[in-house]
Amino acid sequence: MEAWAGAGGLLVNPYREIDMETRIFSKRDIEEAARVLKAGGLVAFPTETVYGLGGNGLSRDAARKIYAAKGRPSDNPLILHVSKIEEVNPLVESIPEKAKLLMESFWPGPLTLILKKSEIVPRESTGGLDTVALRCPDNALSLALIEKAGFPIAGPSANLSGSPSPTEASHVYHDLAGRIEGILDDGAVGIGVESTILDMSGDVPTLLRPGAITLEDLTEVLGEKPEVDPTLVGKKMEDGFIPKAPGMKYRHYAPKAEMILFCAVEEKGSEDKISKRIAEYLEEEGLKFLEEQIAILCAEETKHFYQEMAEKEGIILKVLGRRNEPLSMTHNLFRILRECDEEGIGLILSEGYSEEGIGFALMNRMKKAAGQKIILV
């Protein structure tokens, strides 16, 4: 069991090899956290989506440290966080009118825009690309940290590469204690999945990662529906694929357990179909998992389908949230996947949900967590 003491102290994890002490900052320590960043160190920071792993976005060395701390492939771009729209100007060649309109409509907020970078942005921060990913987070502490630091803060999710994203400071500590200088603790985040990413560097706005700013939201502001990158709708990546945004190329958000997603071809009657298929799967394949603890991820509205079976077979039920409140599911998803890791779950069977609105982001993360292991019903 790893120690966690919250804001205000130096913590050491005795169960991993440690190169440095990781200080836990509270909001009273914002000046000190900024000093660490100015000195070239790394500080995890809260946003409204997930916790980010912060470093100087204009420093080659800081970018390299971020990749090393996470174990992140160096061709996976970082997002630079700014505290206001005006800070974007020196970082890009130009700001297209439509991009400016999106900034004015959704910033601060969970929208990342990709634009052509200027010379001052090092390629170490962009995965070697001539574009840069930018956003202004909707979190008072992160905005204050950016202002105090005086430069854009590069910030991928503050977790080990490939594992579920951190939605609480304790999640960051679990993954990165001893690898970074500090964690700015602001409790649990609100949204729970990473920002929407829209590529505005070409002629046509293109969605690269779904998030809380939905396609419908973007369409309303732009007056046209953005294109959707083919990899988001099932197209396989070709050899040599170069990701323009985080979350595109590599397996992400994955628990240690095998995870299987059960999705309905048609929405009508999907709750009943999915629950019956999960029960059938356990009858057909259950003998393969006699030595494994099994968990079922379900909605509040459908947990009654599984309760008798769970009690009889010793299966753990994890309730993601309510089907008619998908934001409750995004808020809980990564926390629950981490709980499954902590509880030694070997197999996760999960319901699938509607991909309308923010459901597109929810299902994108769930499919990646399952490694695209999907059973259609």
Model regions and ranges:
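Active-site-adjacent structural elements in enzyme catalytic cores
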Residues: 14-377
